[in-house]
Amino acid sequence: MNAVEEIGKRAKLVTSDVANLAVDIRNQILLDMSSALVANWQEIVAANKKDLDAATQLSGPMRNRLTLDQKTIGGIAASLSAVAKLADPLAGPYDNWKNHTGFKIVKKTVPLGVVAMIFEARPNVTVDAAALTFKSGNAVILRGGKEAIESNIILTNILRNVLRKHNLNPDIIQLITDTTHDSVNTLLNLRDYVDVLIPRGSGQFIDFVVKNATVPVIETGAGNTHIFVDESAKQDEAIRVIHNAKTQKPAVCNAAEKLLIHEAIAGEFLPKIVDDLLAAGVELRGDQKARSIDSRVIGASAEDWDTEYNDLIMAIKIVHNNDEAITWINDHTTHHSETIISEDLNHVTDFMNTVDAAVVYQNVSSRFTDGFEFGFGAEIGISTQKLHARGPMGLSALTTIKYEVFGEGQIRE
């Protein structure tokens, strides 16, 4: 049995320990974890510096996601406190009813068991995942990217030390420190120990996990996110929404990557949005129609339309009408978040009913696809599949159903 299998075995052994903890204890531990992160912020920053010094090939936005300082650590700690304040996802009241023979059936909410997370260079995910799985009564196995290994080690050690202080087995939270592909391949196939696997990262990485895992997977989305500006759009509002969705945090999955513009307003609107986005440092690529309107737009390749840039790059297409926009989006979407900027109720209704995505917006930045913004608290990821969970996954997505039956000797005739 190799090291990853041992981690899986140990996680399975402690599932009942965390599942049976009273919610008051779970909440106090989360608060203590929050305090421990704040108290050890200098050690965390020092470890993070080692990661940053080694991460010479990362793009600017990806490097920003990796960086930890006192302020970001304070924000991560605050998210732990926020999770502690959320309602217990395991609490009742539970639905119950009686069978015709008289026995009682209770439909109970229970933890999934062992949750494995594979993610890239985002050390905040280490803490978010640990907090949400712990609050929902699960054990967690974390496997972060090599770019954040030093940060992940110290963060998990701090959280595990808090568990020890509460006389709990630290294996409730475990980190795989082997950053080779071998550890990923092993984790993908730990069906005996892992109940569900949640990958977060690029579309290519998530596709690899989905195609190669024998463990059940909740597919979280790459975000090839579109904004369609309809002919009825308020143009100043559209510019504000597009600017925010593209430039605020370009490396995240809910950032906008593609812009579709109705041809009736393209001549007027395109130069305005080009002015705005170029001033923000965005590289603009587009189809022939877009380039004929504004020569500052460079040519887009066929690959551009299916690429999640995670950077200050955006591709622009001019469309004939609402129907073409919807068809184009459904052909190229990653089923994450899609937006229409429009005042035409019929067009909005068609867009909402027909676009196949977890979240569909009217006149709102896609940057709001987020557990906190949706009122769920921190999120474990954004699911782009339709089974078990879809969209921002909060605490309830980390639970399942168990039926408890109480009777008095009934037998089936």
Curated annotation (Swiss-Prot):
It comes from the Bacteria. Keywords: Amino-acid biosynthesis, Cytoplasm, NADP, Oxidoreductase, Proline biosynthesis. The gene is proA. Catalyzes the NADPH-dependent reduction of L-glutamate 5-phosphate into L-glutamate 5-semialdehyde and phosphate. The product spontaneously undergoes cyclization to form 1-pyrroline-5-carboxylate. It catalyses: L-glutamate 5-semialdehyde + phosphate + NADP(+) = L-glutamyl 5-phosphate + NADPH + H(+). This is Gamma-glutamyl phosphate reductase. InterPro entries: Ald_DH/histidinol_DH, Ald_DH_C, Ald_DH_N, Aldehyde_DH_dom, G-glutamylP_reductase_CS, Glu-5-SA_DH, GPR_dom. It holds the Pfam family Aldedh. GO terms for biological process: L-proline biosynthetic process. It is found in: Cytoplasm. GO terms for molecular function: glutamate-5-semialdehyde dehydrogenase activity; NADP binding. Belongs to the gamma-glutamyl phosphate reductase family. It comes from Leuconostoc mesenteroides subsp. mesenteroides (strain ATCC 8293 / DSM 20343 / BCRC 11652 / CCM 1803 / JCM 6124 / NCDO 523 / NBRC 100496 / NCIMB 8023 / NCTC 12954 / NRRL B-1118 / 37Y). The keyword Manganese does not apply. Pathway: Amino-acid biosynthesis; L-proline biosynthesis; L-glutamate 5-semialdehyde from L-glutamate: step 2/2. Its EC number is 1.2.1.41. One of its GO terms (cellular component) is cytoplasm.
